[in-house]
C-alpha cells in the first residue's frame, strides 16, 4: 500500500493519508489531496470532515474508495469506509482540518473554515 505523507502539519508530521484504491496510480500526492479537500469543503461544523472526505472519494469516482490514516503513535493503521474515515480525521487529527487553508496555497485564502474544533 502506498501512503501519502503530510509533512507540513505541525504535530502530525508522521501522519499519512491514503486516498483512493489499492492501485498506486490512483493515489493522490499530499498537495493534491489537501487542495481537493480544501476546495471542495463547505461551511459547517461537525459535517466539515465528512464533506471533505466524501468529495475526495466522489472525485476519484470510486464507490469503494477509502481513506487510510496511519499515525506512528497508534498501534495500527485505521481503515474506515467513508464517514468512519472522516471521523478518524476529525477526531484524531484535528490539526489536519484546522490547517487545510494554510497548507494548500501561498495566497491568503478567500474562504476561512469556521472554528469548529474546541481544544
List where the protein language model places each region.
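Positively charged, low-complexity terminal tracts
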Residues: 1-119
Amino acid at each position: 500500500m502506498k501512503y501519502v505523507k503530510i509533512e507540513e502539519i505541525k504535530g502530525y508530521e508522521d501522519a499519512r493519508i491514503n486516498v483512493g484504491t489499492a492501485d498506486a496510480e490512483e493515489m493522490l500526492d499530499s498537495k493534491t489531496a489537501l487542495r481537493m479537500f480544501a476546495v471542495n469543503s463547505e461551511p459547517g461544523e461537525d459535517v466539515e470532515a465528512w464533506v471533505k472526505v466524501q468529495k475526495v472519494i466522489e472525485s476519484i469516482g470510486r464507490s469503494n474508495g477509502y481513506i487510510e490514516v496511519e499515525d506512528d503513535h497508534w498501534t495500527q493503521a485505521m481503515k474506515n469506509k467513508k464517514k468512519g474515515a472522516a471521523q478518524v480525521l476529525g477526531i484524531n487529527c484535528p490539526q489536519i482540518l484546522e490547517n487545510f487553508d494554510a497548507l494548500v496555497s501561498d495566497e491568503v485564502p478567500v474562504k476561512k473554515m469556521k472554528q469548529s474544533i474546541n481544544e
